[in-house]
Amino acid sequence: MSSNTVAEFATELKKSPATLLDQLKAAGVGKAALSDALTESDKQRLLAYLQASHGTTSVDRKKITLVKKSTSEIKQADATGKARTIQVEVRKKRTFVKRDDAQEGAADGAGSAAFAEPEHPAPAAQHDVPEAPAEQAQADAAPAADGAAPALSSEDQELARREEQARHQAELIRRQEAELAAKRAAREAREKREREAEERAAAYAAQEAEKKAAASAVKQVATREQAAEATARNAAQLQARAKAAAESKARSDEEAARAADLDARRRKAEAEAAAIRSMLATPKKAVMVAKKPEPPPKPVPKPAAAAGDAKKGTLHKPAVGATRTAAGAARAGAAAGAPGAGKEVKSAKLSSSWAGDPAKKKEIKTRGDSSGGVGRNNWRGGPRGRRGDSRDQRDEHLQAAPAETRIIEVHVPETITVAEVAHKMSIKASEVIKALMKMGQMVTINQPLDQDTAMIVVEELGHKAVVAALDDPEAFADDDVAQQSIEVLPRAPVVTVMGHVDHGKTSLLDYIRRAKVAASEAGGITQHIGAYHVQTPRGMVSFLDTPGHEAFTAMRARGAQATDIVILVVAADDGVMPQTREAIKHAKAAGVPIVVAITKADKPDANLDRVKQELIGEQVVPEDYGGDSPFVAVSSKTGQGIDALLEHVLLQADVMELKAPVDALAKGLVIEAQLDKGRGPVATVLVQSGTLKVGDVVLAGQTFGRVRAMLDENGRPAKTAGPSIPVEIQGLTEVPQAGDEFMVLTDERRAREIATYRAGRFRNTKLAKQQAAKLEHVFADMTAGEVKMLPIIVKADVQGSQEALAQSLLKLSTDEVKVQLVYAAVGAISESDINLAIASKAVVIGFNVRADAGARKLAEGNGVALHYYSIIYDAVDELRVAMSGMLAPEQREEIIGTAEIRTVFTASKIGTVAGSYITSGMVHRNARFRLLRANVVVHTGEVDSIKRLKDDVREVKEGFECGIKLKNYSDILEGDQLEFFDIKQIARTL
């Protein structure tokens, strides 16, 4: 087949068309495109060019070699039975030889050309030398030119390919058999080695048994010798331990002596430094002398110089006589030409930090001094011929040894003033200010510095800065309270009244105090912790009245922690209730004794035995039954059993022997806290030890302050408060947390540092918890459905009520509606609270507080809802109703009727219509339906329209026939049943 175009010729030659075009152009054949036609003459020119380029000019070729390559795949299973795909590549090479004319004539019945035997095909792993492009072109062009070479038959190709595949398969099988044989031989060798190892182990075990049997006799003999050696060795060890203990004691004594020596040297150096500072602080007077001739100075005796060398390097204040002698020697050494030499010169042995700069500091001008006292030792310092004095003075300064630099380890707290930094380094405050000015900070001597800045300044001045760990406040209190002898005296018991709501706790205290507190409580329930102390014939008793409502769990827990005795109030007509059980748990957790007061004993339906049995079930056993809890039946109206109750309380206190120091710094507990508009932060505290006085520095949690005023429970001013006395204090910087411990410190700066540290630590902990919660719930929030949020802002009158209300509201959260507490604080509602509510779209709740005029106006202008409550029940109930309105309504089905399809007909403009008979109830337009076929629901949809006697109707009742058109559904049959229902939305509640 002759090639007519360049592309066909390139395909026939199995060459790149671009390469063929380049070769054609080089051969002088002008072909520019692949579609250009090629003639036989063009092919001859290309062949001649290629032969010439490869060094062959003979056109007469006697032999042509054809190379053909084919690729195939075979699948063969290996030894494991897994099928493997093998790539097989077959290469064939055939050579065609052109015979001479004589040979053609001699050939008998032979063809015009004969081909040699095909060479063995090379497998894919062998590499054949590729034919040159010119030879390929010649191989393709020669048959075209001569027309005598026969084409390679396809049958021969297939036969050769199959032979090659068979050969490869046979080789693969032989290789696999060899591998299997090698593995089998290796396994047999391994098994043989294992058997030999087992035999050797058995032989070794037998030998060992024989050796052990032989050695057992030897061991019996050696045991006695070993016992003797052990006894001697133990004695040697005891001697070595005694020697080591003696050496250790000697070393410890030596270290103690060294430490004492260092301490003595340090105290001596500090005393010398203090003496020098006092000397330098004393103003000096210039010595004015008349200029008169003096005899030349005499050389200083050697013993004096030796004495001076002995004191070199130490800070010694010169004696008065020595100072005068030195001054006289200076005056004697200065001649008439050295004016001003009579001035008292500062000692060169002082520290360099106290030495003035002679080039900048002006000296006092004396008689005959024309230099103005400046640079008396420079080139203008005196007349000619007197340079020896300056040289002598310069030599004296050079010979004086510099003061030894002492590196101080400075402990830097959280905040420290400039003066304190200088004091810790024993330098002037001006040096610290100068160093800070070099760092770009303008500070004053009393300005506080942060820890990082102070440490940098200390390092800049050549000392070592160490972060001072903030001491434990308890350690501070112990340091302040610890005295040589603190006398402990008996104190009054602190009694907490606990029990269920409406069981008569406050009424019982009212009768004891002869007051009427219960009548003034909102709703008749206690919502704050009340603290009182009462004088009885047998002594004083302090009472804590805790709320009984379930929301005030934290208040009851604080009351149990601060108390000595718990009075458990149980109503005789009500028995043990949930808050009664909770109070018992708090008392047992605090480890305080319980005195049971069964109130309302005068009521007709009182059942004391039932109350006792219920309390026994809560592990509170009365004394009558062999327990340790006295039971007293009381009545707050008639006073029945009140004296017996107090008698039991005081008897229990006597048994406990309650004592506390009186003449000491006060410690106690914050019972309640609030923010008063006129008085500021106010805290009700219970003094547990020591005496609290007006003017004391108080540290309570994260707040501190100086006590400005104290009031007792009746509102009267008080100057002091001893142990077990509750008082109300003013003067704190912020409202403390209820339940915090308070203590009195002697240093206000220390109290400020501790409060600041606690606030920062609390803030960091809170932020860390919030971040952890965000990271923990981020995926849950992404996967969960949309949850409705109800943001609220809570402002209350006291800390305990705010805490209780916030916790109660947060407990109302569900999976669908959550309460988001934006802000909760103590005090009146301010404009900042309203602005926060506007930004967060929150509801503002005021508990026993009101909004000021500016806040009310701002709330009305921006539509912020303000809700005021005085009873915690009302706040919780109203918020529960609001959250119920945010819940998605419940979808509920209500069946309204059924119908039977008796006929089915089709209208041209309407479609399929079900002729139905209403068997029960009724059906109306747009009602929902279920299609039942053989009592199986096959479709649920909506009624499109209803017709009766060709008229559209809204509804059809039981016993009537009608035509019903179903919306988007027409697969209905006679005998089907239709069940009609409506979906009603039912409001949900929490």
Swiss-Prot record:
Using the UniProt annotation, give all residue ranges assigned to the region (Disordered).
92-402
Q: Record the organism.
A: Verminephrobacter eiseniae (strain EF01-2)
Its annotated function is as follows: One of the essential components for the initiation of protein synthesis. Protects formylmethionyl-tRNA from spontaneous hydrolysis and promotes its binding to the 30S ribosomal subunits. Also involved in the hydrolysis of GTP during the formation of the 70S ribosomal complex.
- SUPFAM superfamilies, per database record: Initiation factor IF2/eIF5b, domain 3 (SSF52156), P-loop containing nucleoside triphosphate hydrolases (SSF52540), Putative DNA-binding domain (SSF46955), Translation proteins (SSF50447)
UniProt-recorded Gene Ontology molecular function terms: GTP binding; GTPase activity; translation initiation factor activity
Q: Could you tell me which CDD domains the record lists for this protein?
A: IF2_eIF5B, IF2_mtIF2_II, mtIF2_IVc
- Compartment(s) of residence: Cytoplasm
- Residue ranges occupied by any tr-type G domain in the UniProt entry: 490-659
**What segment(s) does the record annotate as region G5?**
635-637
> Which segments carry the region annotation G3?
545-548
User: Quick one: where's region G2?
Assistant: 524-528
Q: Which InterPro entries match?
A: DNA-bd_dom_put_sf, EF-G-like_DII, IF2_assoc_dom_bac, IF2_II, IF2_N, P-loop_NTPase, Small_GTP-bd, T_Tr_GTP-bd_dom
Primary subcellular site in the record, as a coarse category: cytoplasm
Q: Which Pfam families match?
A: EF-G_D2, GTP_EFTU, IF-2, IF2_assoc, IF2_N
The name under which this protein is listed is: Translation initiation factor IF-2
The entry sums up its family as follows: Belongs to the TRAFAC class translation factor GTPase superfamily. Classic translation factor GTPase family. IF-2 subfamily.
Biased segments, Low complexity type: 104-116, 131-151, 223-243, 281-290, 318-342
- Asked if the keyword Nucleotide-binding belongs to this entry, the reply reads yes
Region labeled G4 — which residues?
599-602
